Amino acid sequence: MIEVVGDSSRNGEVALVRLTLDGDRIVDADADGLERPLAGLSLLEAAAVPGEKLAADALANALAQVFRATPEPNRVAVAMSGGVDSAVALLHAGRDAIGVTLRLWIDPAAPDSERACCSPEAVIAARETCHARGLPHVTLDLRDEFRRAVVAPFIRGYAAGETPNPCIRCNGSFRFAELLAFAERAGASRLATGHYARIVERDGFRLLARARDPVKDQSYMLARLDPRLLGRIWFPLGEQTKDETRAEAERAGLAASRRAESQEACFLGGGDYRDFLRRHGVAAEPGEIIDEDGRHRGKHAGFWGFTTGQRRGLGVSSHQPLYVLSTDAQANTVVVGPRESLAVETISARGRLYVQVDRAEVKWRYRSPAVPAAVVQTERGFRLHLDAPAYGVSPGQAAVLYDDGVVVGAGVL
């Protein structure tokens, strides 16, 4: 037998749960504030027991340390964010679903941390959505791991003069690795999420594809997922629109139907990335703004506060519009010039081609239009020869390749 303890505190109040386990069954429990006794329940059954918020938090913290369940072919683990999309994904997963929410690190100085998909408030909303349907829910506290795997590279990238995309790094490796590992411990046959994307078969391979709703399509953010994992993943919202999702949530009476959308880069908590970087050690050292010929054009307060293609806020007067062409971390300079100097026709990326293609459409921003290109595989990824010049491309961005709406490759510029 083993003993596990979970606690939770808020506004000076504290709750404590102590469980004695024999295998995956609770033989004794000291847990006030829950709606039913825990003794005699399996860990899976205990995860479905609701209660007062602090008590439910404390129970979740205890269960997360040891959670496991006997495999069940119909069981689906559903990644829950507390929002409407994951709540409707839970509906699609049926009566054998189990919800799981990742509690991730959020900047404690963020102006609006409640907007984040991984905040304590989001965790509570996700748990209550599951418990309202009599379904189990588990919270995984991965704040330290997330900060090392996603936040630290984001800070290092900007300090080195790159424009990193933390959401692609998170979804392409960290988040889904943790969720799939949990699904296995929970005895679930697959993992469902509320992302708007599809999985298709092509030439004997499972590949990611754009969602039916072009406005909500999230295949770009998911593009670095290893296709070998797609056999264990399900995107139940991929064939429907956001309006259909909200209508479904309202018909089911889900509280999440009224929850506001969370922003990207959740750890920023609604704040500006420049303020975040200053708070977390990226020095704002003054330097020169120069033109392509090296002539002085002005001063900046930190090169990393400028993005390739940026036009506004340069603080430089000119008879013609000037754009940021590049930044140089070593020299601490920002280079500006006319828009035509932004044009690039060849792009190289570190990454992989999931299938062999000679041509594809490439996106290097979530909202950027796709540009046709010839594709050449290289030792470390691929090189793209664009049919038309691209503007505002910068190191650190993600390049995602599509062929007829299917993701056929992804990498980092």
Descriptions of predicted regions:
Residues P71-A223, D243-E244, E250:
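ATP-dependent adenylation/nucleotidyltransferase module used to activate substrates
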